[in-house]
């Protein structure tokens, strides 16, 4: 007789109780009970678990139906319940435990697509039953309903082979990468309601292409119960959220983006999950997907639970999920959310609320190993798909190869650059000279990682103000400041990311419950001109390889004057692979026009203006050179043997090149 003990999160330490007397031994099963080996899954080495876990339409013993399979190691009994049995716990719908590691399975004939179902999971002691959505379901009910829905992964005719071949052959380090981050539920709406994936594709693809972005980044589109979580507190990791349609609708959107040479990145959350009763939390009545130690599992700051990244079956769940999005939906990359929460045992915890690792440090060794393995898998099997880390600390080696003891990400968000520069642009220009280092410090560590410069959704919500409203001054100065900031960002080494709405100067913060304020573009000329500015700036970036071909090489950037704090001016050169490709940036962070401003240049010759943020067509004051030509002289400046004299626009960026 089993020694029954009700299991829950332990205050200190992990749940270590073993199930059954015959540990590690699997009972013999008939062919119809288990057609697959679960060895890789149980070892944490399975990368396509979604192909056999969950609910799959199959034919067994000449009967068509659905094979249900789930993992619940401490459950004493599991029922499949749903529309087909009036949601009742009946013995004929009881799943069979096909090995002692907790794999349960059941074949039910004559079930059709669209039927709703759940797993009724009885705990080890048999005294409590929880009703769980299928962790591997491909479809879920629209919130607030919580059941899984039987659906097939239908065939889809992709037309993006050329794109995928190019992705596999060519990396992005020496290519332009300008990402448009968006939330599908609030980018645009139709009569106040969500648009379908197909409806979104009709307007999004053309807009992104016209605006000159190279990639879109979708905030999470797996199923999640709370709109206000924006998808970052998930339940259905394999369910495409039903808010906007079905699997093939999403595939159609991605296919169209690819056919228009636009890449697709996806925000992905392998760090933590929501505690909703129908989800992964305490799945079999005990800690299953989360850590057994409550201090380690509980994420107090977000009200969520942290994945147990050392548990083999959880690793298989997450590795397979990453490859699911890449293989089934042709996603070009995953932006891994909350990496700091994964790496640090003391993240968000006070002294005494956490325990050190076996070496006495605060690094989560299981998470470190998980991330290395994740990135190794994607590099080996992802056919050119990338990973991006949202990581806010100075942890070393985020983008260093795994073979060199790095974590193996392709890129890392530069949160330091973002925080420094945003705090600077909110300052009155009178005080900016005292904080000049906020604008030049990033180049001190720029080549320590492969960075993306992010202005993301997190910066324009929860009282942080919209990007335009962060700018100092009256309306004219705000829009001038926005143009200046965006052009400085475009000139700075690193790939780029901008959140939706920033490109036309939306004044209100982002609101996930309504669409962007598209109406202001037509109603107010300055918003139209701001949108035209971002379009011109994006295309200028695309057309000039010096802005992206050597982002991660020191020879791609050279300061002209990094230290002019008194006048709050930064000047630098961007250099392309072809050393003749040079652009000179002069960024003035004051509202004063600087006449007869001396700038060092790399060579003698005639210099012309190629971009000016103060142009009248963008809403500026018109302090432009036009067709004027500046002849360099042999008068030295700083480290340069030659110089020119220019007029620098107020709160503006002037970009020059040799004729």
From Swiss-Prot:
It holds the Pfam family CBM_48. CDD domains: AmyAc_Glg_BE, E_set_GBE_prok_N. GO terms for cellular component: cytosol. It catalyses: Transfers a segment of a (1->4)-alpha-D-glucan chain to a primary hydroxy group in a similar glucan chain. The keyword Glycosyltransferase applies. One of its GO terms (biological process) is glycogen biosynthetic process. Residues 1-12 have a biased composition (Basic and acidic residues). It comes from the Bacteria. GO terms for molecular function: 1,4-alpha-glucan branching enzyme activity; cation binding; hydrolase activity, hydrolyzing O-glycosyl compounds. Residues 1-25 are annotated as: Disordered. Its EC number is 2.4.1.18. Pathway: Glycan biosynthesis; glycogen biosynthesis. The keyword Hydrolase does not apply. Keywords: Carbohydrate metabolism, Glycogen biosynthesis, Glycogen metabolism, Glycosyltransferase, Transferase. The active site is at 337 (nucleophile), 390 (proton donor). Catalyzes the formation of the alpha-1,6-glucosidic linkages in glycogen by scission of a 1,4-alpha-linked oligosaccharide from growing alpha-1,4-glucan chains and the subsequent attachment of the oligosaccharide to the alpha-1,6 position. Belongs to the glycosyl hydrolase 13 family. GlgB subfamily. Monomer. NCBIfam families: branching_enzym (TIGR01515), PRK05402.1 (NF003811), PRK12313.1 (NF008967). This is 1,4-alpha-glucan branching enzyme GlgB. It comes from Clostridium perfringens (strain ATCC 13124 / DSM 756 / JCM 1290 / NCIMB 6125 / NCTC 8237 / Type A). The gene is glgB.
């Amino acid at each position: 007789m089993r020694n029954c003990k009700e299991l829950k999160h332990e205050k200190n330490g992990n749940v270590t109780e073993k199930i059954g007397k015959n540990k590690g031994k699997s009972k013999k099963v008939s062919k119809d009970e288990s057609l697959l080996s679960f060895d890789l899954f149980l070892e944490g080495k399975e990368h396509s678990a979604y192909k056999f876990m969950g609910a799959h339409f199959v034919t067994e013993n000449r009967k068509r139906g659905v094979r249900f399979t789930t993992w619940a190691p401490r459950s004493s009994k599991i029922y499949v319940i749903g529309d087909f049995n009036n949601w009742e716990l009946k013995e004929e719908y009881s799943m069979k435990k096909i090995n002692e590691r907790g794999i349960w399975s059941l074949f039910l004939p004559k079930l059709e697509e669209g039927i709703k179902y759940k797993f009724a999971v009885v705990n080890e002691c048999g005294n409590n039953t929880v009703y769980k959505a299928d962790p591997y379901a491909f479809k879920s009910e629209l919130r607030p309903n919580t059941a899984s829905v039987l659906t097939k992964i239908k065939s889809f005719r992709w037309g993006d082979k050329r794109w995928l071949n190019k992705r596999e052959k060519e990396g992005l380090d020496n290519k332009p990468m300008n990402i448009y981050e968006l939330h599908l539920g609030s980018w645009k709406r139709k009569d106040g309601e969500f648009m379908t994936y197909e409806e979104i594709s009709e307007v999004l693809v053309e807009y992104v292409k016209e605006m000159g972005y190279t990639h879109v980044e979708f905030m999470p589109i797996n199923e999640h119960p709370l709109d206000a979580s924006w998808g970052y507190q998930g339940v259905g990791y394999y369910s495409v959220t039903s808010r906007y349609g079905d699997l093939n609708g999403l595939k159609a959107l991605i296919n169209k983006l690819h056919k228009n040479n636009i890449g697709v990145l996806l925000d992905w959350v392998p760090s933590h999950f929501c505690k909703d009763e129908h989800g992964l939390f305490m799945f079999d009545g005990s800690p299953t997907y989360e850590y057994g130690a409550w201090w380690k599992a509980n994420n107090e700051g977000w009200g969520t639970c942290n994945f147990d990244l050392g548990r083999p079956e959880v690793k298989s769940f997450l590795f397979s999920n990453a490859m699911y999005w890449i293989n089934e939906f042709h996603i070009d990359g995953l932006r891994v959310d909350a990496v700091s929460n994964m790496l640090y045992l003391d993240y968000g915890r006070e002294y005494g609320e956490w325990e050190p690792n076996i070496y006495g440090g605060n690094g989560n060794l299981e998470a470190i190993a998980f991330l290395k393995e994740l990135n190794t898998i994607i590099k080996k099997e992802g056919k050119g798909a990338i990973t991006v880390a949202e990581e806010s600390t100075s942890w070393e080696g985020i983008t260093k190869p795994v073979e060199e003891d790095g974590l193996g990400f392709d890129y890392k968000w530069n949160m330091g650059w973002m925080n420094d520069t945003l705090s600077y642009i909110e300052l009155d220009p009178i005080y900016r000279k005292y904080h000049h280092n906020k604008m030049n410090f990033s180049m001190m560590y720029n080549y320590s990682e492969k960075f993306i410069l992010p202005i993301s959704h997190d910066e324009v919500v929860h009282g942080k103000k919209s990007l335009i409203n962060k700018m100092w001054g009256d309306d004219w100065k705000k829009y001038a400041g926005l143009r200046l900031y965006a052009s400085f960002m475009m000139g700075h080494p690193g790939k780029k990311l901008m959140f939706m709405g920033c490109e036309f100067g939306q004044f209100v913060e982002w609101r996930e419950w309504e669409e962007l304020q598209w109406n202001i573009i037509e109603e107010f000329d300055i918003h139209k001109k701001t949108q035209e500015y971002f379009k011109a700036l994006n295309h200028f970036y695309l057309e000039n390889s010096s802005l992206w071909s050597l982002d991660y090489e020191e020879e791609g950037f050279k300061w002209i004057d990094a230290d002019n704090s008194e006048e709050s001016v930064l000047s630098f050169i961007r250099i392309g692979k072809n050393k003749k490709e040079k652009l000179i940036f002069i960024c003035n962070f004051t509202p004063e026009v600087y006449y007869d401003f001396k700038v060092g240049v790399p060579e003698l010759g005639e210099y012309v203006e190629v971009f000016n943020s103060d142009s009248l067509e963008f809403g500026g004051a018109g302090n432009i050179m036009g067709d004027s030509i500046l002849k360099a002289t042999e008068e030295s400046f700083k480290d340069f043997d030659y110089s020119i004299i220019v007029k620098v626009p107020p709160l503006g960026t002037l970009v020059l090149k040799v004729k």
